Amino acid sequence: MDFGLLPPEINSGRMYTGPGPGPMLAAATAWDGLAVELHATAAGYASELSALTGAWSGPSSTSMASAAAPYVAWMSATAVHAELAGAQARLAIAAYEAAFAATVPPPVIAANRAQLMVLIATNIFGQNTPAIMMTEAQYMEMWAQDAAAMYGYAGSSATASRMTAFTEPPQTTNHGQLGAQSSAVAQTAATAAGGNLQSAFPQLLSAVPRALQGLALPTASQSASATPQWVTDLGNLSTFLGGAVTGPYTFPGVLPPSGVPYLLGIQSVLVTQNGQGVSALLGKIGGKPITGALAPLAEFALHTPILGSEGLGGGSVSAGIGRAGLVGKLSVPQGWTVAAPEIPSPAAALQATRLAAAPIAATDGAGALLGGMALSGLAGRAAAGSTGHPIGSAAAPAVGAAAAAVEDLATEANIFVIPAMDD
C-alpha cells in the first residue's frame, strides 16, 4: 500500500477512527504478566533441582534433574522472549502515538475543502484565484504530511514487529515407555472391575426409566405374584418408621395404653385431698386465734367449702361409663358433685391445741398432716373428704404441764393457703 496515493481524508480518517493504542497496550501488559509467571515457575523448578542434586542426591534424583533441566531452560528463555514481546508492543504504541500526532486532524481538512468550495463559487470575475491557489497549496501540504506520517508509522511498526520466534518446549518423557504405558492402561480397562464399572452406568440409565414407568402404570395391571422392587423398598421404609414410632424407648413403649386409665383413676383419688388439708392446717395448729395480718384467713376458712364426709378414707371411688357428672358444661367424675360441708371456724379449732404439742406432733401427727395436704389445685371442688387426726391430740396429756408454762408465748405456725377455684 502506497500512502502517498491516498488523500489526507483517508489517512487522517483511518488514524482518528481506529481503535487507538488500547489493544496494543493490553497486549503489552499481557506479555509482561506472562514473563513474570514464567520467571517464577522457572525459579521454582530450579530450586527443586538444586534440592535433588543436594541432600537427595542419587541415581533417581540425577535422572529427574537431567529430564527437568531442559524444560527449566526453555521456561527461562521463553520468559525473556515474553519480556521482549511486551517491549516491542510498547514500541508499536509509541510509533502510533507519533503518527497520530503528525497526522492532520480531519476537521482541518474538511474546513480547507469547504473554503475551497466557497472561493470557487464566488470567483465570478477571477478575483479569488490567488486564494484558491493558496487553499490548494495548503491541502497538498496536508496530503504530504499525512503520507509522511503514515510512512513513518509503517516503518516504526515494522521495527516493533521484529521478534524472535518462540520455540516449543523440549520433550521430557521417554518415547520408548509410552507403548508400555498404553498397554498397562488397556489391561486395566479390561479387568473385571473396569467391566463392572462400565456396565453399571448403562444399567442405571435403563433402571431409572423402568422405575418411573412402573410408578406411572396402574396397580391392577401388575402381576400379583411379582412385587416390584420399589414396593419392597417402601415396605422396608414403613417398617423402619414403625419401629421409630413404637419402639421400646418411645412414649407408647414406656407408657402403654393400659396405663392411661390408671393415671386417670389415681388423679381422681388424689384430687379429693385438697380442701381437707386446708382444714387440718387452719383448724388444728396453734393455741390462739389468728389475729393481726393473718386475720383474713379466718374469714377465708369460713367461706371455703370442703367436700367429703368424716373419716380418713374419704369418699368411695366409683367407676362407670357414660355416667359422668356435670359441673356447668364440664363433665367431671361422680364424686366431684357431692355437696361440700361447711368448714368449722379456725378460731374455735385453734383454741384446742397448745404450742407445746408441736414437738410431739411432728412425729405423731405427720401422717395426718400429709394426708390432708392438698394434692391438686381444685380446692373448692375437692372430693368428699378425709378428716385428718388433730395434730397433737394424742400428745396433749403428756405435755400438759409444759403447755401451761408456755401458754402466753406467741404462737407461730406455717400456713399453706390454697385459693378456691371458680366453678
UniProtKB/Swiss-Prot annotation:
Consequence of gene loss (knockout): Invasion of the infant human brain microvascular endothelial-cell monolayer is significantly decreased in transposon mutant.
InterPro entries on file: PPE_C, PPE_dom, PPE_sf
A GO biological process held by the record: response to host immune response
Gene3D superfamilies: PPE superfamily (1.20.1260.20)
Protein induction: Highly up-regulated during the early stages of invasion of the human blood-brain barrier.
Gene Ontology cellular component list: peptidoglycan-based cell wall
Family, as annotated: Belongs to the mycobacterial PPE family.
Stated role: Could be required for host endothelial-cell invasion and/or intracellular survival.
Name of this protein: Uncharacterized PPE family protein PPE29
Organism, as annotated: Mycobacterium tuberculosis (strain ATCC 25618 / H37Rv)
Encoding gene per record: PPE29
